[in-house]
Swiss-Prot record:
Isoform 6 encodes peptide NmS-33, at positions 92 to 124, as a result of splicing out of an exon that encodes a processing site which generates NmS-17. Similar 33-mers and 36-mers have been isolated from human and from mouse and rat, respectively, although they do not arise by alternative splicing. It is found in: Secreted. Belongs to the NmU family. InterPro entries: Neuromedin-U_amidation-site, NmS. Expressed by the skin glands. Residues 28-89, 92-117, 140-145 form a propeptide. The gene is nms. Coiled coil: none annotated. Keywords: Amidation, Secreted, Signal. This is Neuromedin-S. GO terms for cellular component: extracellular region. Residues 1-27 form the signal peptide.
Amino acid sequence: MRSEKHLPPLPLLLAICCLGTLHPSSGFPQSVPSYMEALDIPESEKLAFCFSQWTALPDQEQIPSFVMDLCSSIYNRMKVNEENNHEIYKRFLFQFSRTKDPSLKTGESQIATAEYTKRDSSGIVGRPFFLFRPRNGRKVSINEH
C-alpha cells in the first residue's frame, strides 16, 4: 500500500504565487466583498472578478506581462477543469438515471420462474416460494399475509 501525500492543487499554488508578486500599493482589493463569500460561485469566476477589479483601477502600477500571462493561464486551466468535472458529473447522472431492462426476457427466465412456482393442495398456482419462504422451518399460510 502506497502512502500518498495530499498536495494542494497546482492552480491554487500558481494563483497564490501570482498574487504574491503584486505590491500592496498596486491598488489590488485586499478582501473579497462579503456578498461573494455567501454565494456558491466557482473559484475561476471569483478569480476573474478579482482580476477585473484590479485591472479597472486607474491608479495601479503597470502590470508585468508575464504576471498577466501567468494569471490568464491559471484562469483558463481552472475553467477547463470545472467544465470537465461538470461533464463527468452529467455522464455519471445519465448513466445511473436510466432504467435497466431485465437481461433475460424469455427462455431461461421463464423456465426458472416455472421451477420456483409451487402449487398448493388444491392445484392452484401459488406465488413463487422464495417470496413467502418461512424461516426456522415454520409454515406460513397465505391467509396470514
